[in-house]
Amino acid sequence: MMLTITTINNKTYYAFYSTRYEYIVLNDLNNKKFIKVIDSNGHKNFLQTSVIENVEVDASKDALEKFEKRAEVSN
């Protein structure tokens, strides 16, 4: 599943997780932890979940392909 994350300062980040880890990811989002993300330029980073304002989930078949295209931006 690909996550499109918007923060309180209006920045957008992306993350990809296997759907079998969905419960763990959603639990981390609610417990003020850090998650691995890429920014809109494709750079890898860690994001503190307390700054997240909105999360959109894409669980479609082509979600991984969409995420890989985002990750290729910096390469």
Give the ranges of each region predicted by the language model.
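Short, mixed-charge low-complexity intrinsically disordered segments
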Residues: 37-75
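Acidic, low-complexity, intrinsically disordered interaction modules
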Residues: 16-51
